[in-house]
């Protein structure tokens, strides 16, 4: 059985800008870049990030990375620090 998750948009920020934020974040490296970035999952719900079950976050790491790869491929250039990617992502299966 395949589970699908849809992320409506994602914010990609440099590590140094997120050290003080209370959010569910996942460090990884973007393609074509040697800089480490963090991906914060966003949705159209009103639930805060801290309300997400920990098991849900662990299960979605690969999907979050796939979303970041999708966004980075849409932008031919590497996102600059604090640039938000607000394009709607396509459904990604994991």
UniProtKB/Swiss-Prot annotation:
Cysteines engaged in disulfide bonds, as pairs: none
Signal peptide: 1-18
Glycosylation sites per record: 44
Species per Swiss-Prot/TrEMBL record: Homo sapiens
Other information: This putative protein is only present in primates and not in other mammals.
Tissue spec. comment: Specifically expressed in adult testis.
Keywords recorded for this protein, A-Z: Glycoprotein, Secreted, Signal
Gene of this entry: PRNT
Cellular compartment(s): Secreted
Lineage: Eukaryota, Metazoa, Chordata, Craniata, Vertebrata
Entry's Gene Ontology cellular component terms: extracellular region
Main location: secreted
Record's protein name: Putative testis-specific prion protein
InterPro entries to which the protein is assigned, alphabetical: PRNT (IPR029172)
Pfam families: PRNT (PF15174)
